[in-house]
Amino acid sequence: MANVVVTGEQLDKSIREVVRILEDAVGCTAGPKGLTVAIGKSYGAPEVTKDGYKVIKSIKPEDPLALAIANIITQSASQCNDKVGDGTTTCSILTAKVIEEVSKAKAAGADIVCIKEGVLKAKEAVLEALMSMKREVLSEEEIAQVATISANGDKNIGSKIAQCVQEVGKDGVITVEESKGFKELDVEKTDGMQFDRGYLSPYFVTNSEKMLVEFENPYILLTEKKLNIIQPILPILENVARSGRPLLIIAEDVEGEALSTLVLNKLRGGLHVAAVKAPGFGDRRKDMLGDIAILTGAKHVISDDLAIKMEDLTLAELGTAKNIRITKDTTTIIGSVDNSSANVQSRINQIKMQIEASTSDYDKEKLRERLAKLSGGVAVLKVGGSSEVEVKERKDRVEDALHATRAAVEEGVVPGGGAALLYTLSVLENLKSKNDDEQLGINIVKRALQAPIKRIIKNSGSENAPCVIAHLLKQNDKELIFNVDTMNFANAFTSGVIDPLKVVRIAFDFAVSLAAVFMTLNAIVVDVPSKDDANAGAGGMGGMGGMGGF
C-alpha cells in the first residue's frame, strides 16, 4: 500500500460528489411520501428500508478517497443516531446543502475562515430559536401523533406506541421484537426490568449491525463478588454449554482472566455468554440484585455472606428470563419466570412498606426508583408480516418512531415537516456580521434551513416548494405547516404534523458541525494499492488476475 495526499480542487470536487450521492440515496426517504431503498447484501435478499441511518451506513465507495469522505459523514450520522435514534435523513439533507453552498463561495474566492465563523454564529442563533418554539407532549394523542409522523404516516404504529407509553408510563421500558406470526403489530405487557449497565466487552455482541446482545431464554448468574479468575464459574459454564442456552453474568465486575476467557469462549462459539456490572453501589447494589433474583427466579445471589459457593450452583438455581437485550449502556430483562409473579408482588409490597417507614428523603427516593423498576414492567412491540423483508422494513419504522417518541417526551415538540427550521430564518435576518464573508456564512445557513421542507415536498411529487415556503413565511404564524398527505396548509398541533425538538435540534447541530469540518479540510491522506501490491496478489493466483491486494 502507498499513501497519497489529496488536496485542493480535487478534494473539494470529491467531497461534493460523495455528499451529493449520499444525500440522493438518503434524502429520497424523507417525509410521509418518501421512497424506500433496497440495500444489497453479500448473501440473502436485499433489505428494503426507509431508515436513513441504515442507508448511509451501507454506502461504501470503492475509491479510497470517496470511502474516507463517506466514513467521516457516516461517523457523524452514527453519533446523531446514538443520541436520538432518528434524524439522520434531515442531518444528511442539511449537510449536503451547506457543503454545496460553501463550495460555490469558495470557488468565488471568499475567505473560508470568515464563512465558517458566520455559519457557526448562525447555528447558535437557530438552536436558540428552536428552543423557543417547543411545546410539551402531555396527552396520549400527541404521543401517537409524534410516533405516526416518524413512522412515515403509519397510524397503526403511532397508536400502538402510544398504547405502550400508557401501559408502562413515559419513563417505562419499551422494546421491539420480531414476531413469528403474520399480525403486523401487537403489544404485549410483561414483567421485566431495565438498569443502566451495558456489556463489559463489545465482543459479547450478537447483533453487530445494532451493537446489541440479544438472548432468548437465557440463564442468569447473580453475584455481589468481583470475578477475576475463571475457576469458580467453570462448572457453571460447562453445564450451561451442555444445555445449549445462553448465560448472562451480573456481577460487581468481571475482569482479567475471567473476562478474557468468557470472550474467547463466545468468539469460538462454544458458549453464548455476556457479562454486565451489577446496578447500584453498596447496600443499594445488594438490594437491586435481590430484586433481579426475585424477578428471574434465581435461588441465590452469591456473596461472601452466603454459605453456598459459586462452583456448587446447579442450573436449577440460576435465574431465567424470556429475553435479554443489552446495549453498551443498558440491560433489559424481558419476561420473568412463570412462577415469579407472586414473589414479585410480595417484593413490591415489601418496598412500599420500607418507603412508608423511612424517614430519609434520599432513601425514599432510591426505594421509589426500585419500586418503579420492579413494578413498571416492560411493553413489547411485536412486529410481524408475511415475509422477512416486510418485517424488517416495518421494524425499522417502529424503532425510529419509538426513538422519536422518547425524544418528544423528553424535550417537547415543534412544528413538523421542516417548518420549524424554516421559521428560524427570522432570527438570522437581524444577526450582525463582522464582514461580507461572515454574512455569506449566515446566508448559507439560511438556504440550508429551507432544504428539508423542499425535499419533503419534492418526495411528495410536487414542484411547488418555493410557493409553499413563501406562503408559510408570509403568514407570520409559526404553528402553520404544509401537510403533504393532504397537500394543504394546517395547524401543526391540531393536524399532528409535529417533530420532536430533540431530533430536529441534534440533526441540525450535527449537520452544521460536520459541514464546518469539511469547510477547512485542506487535505486527506489515503492508502491506495501500489503496483507491487497488485503484482504480489497476481503472483499467487496462477494467471487469474490476483485479488486486488487482499
UniProtKB/Swiss-Prot annotation:
Catalysed reaction equations from the record: ATP + H2O + a folded polypeptide = ADP + phosphate + an unfolded polypeptide
Main location: cytoplasm
One Pfam family named in its UniProt record: Cpn60_TCP1
tRNA-binding as UniProt keyword: no
Localization per Swiss-Prot or TrEMBL: Cytoplasm
Gene Ontology terms for molecular function: ATP binding; ATP-dependent protein folding chaperone; isomerase activity; unfolded protein binding
UniProt-listed GO biological process terms: protein refolding
GO cellular component terms, A-Z: cytoplasm
EC number of the protein: 5.6.1.7
Keywords recorded for this protein, A-Z: ATP-binding, Chaperone, Cytoplasm, Isomerase, Nucleotide-binding
UniProt superkingdom: Bacteria
Keyword Nucleotide-binding recorded: yes
Residues where ATP binds: T29, A30, G31, P32, K50, D86, G87, T88, T89, T90, G417, D499
Main function: Together with its co-chaperonin GroES, plays an essential role in assisting protein folding. The GroEL-GroES system forms a nano-cage that allows encapsulation of the non-native substrate proteins and provides a physical environment optimized to promote and accelerate protein folding.
PANTHER family named in the record: 60 KDA HEAT SHOCK PROTEIN, MITOCHONDRIAL (PTHR45633)
Subunit and interaction comment: Forms a cylinder of 14 subunits composed of two heptameric rings stacked back-to-back. Interacts with the co-chaperonin GroES.
Stated family: Belongs to the chaperonin (HSP60) family.
Protein name: Chaperonin GroEL
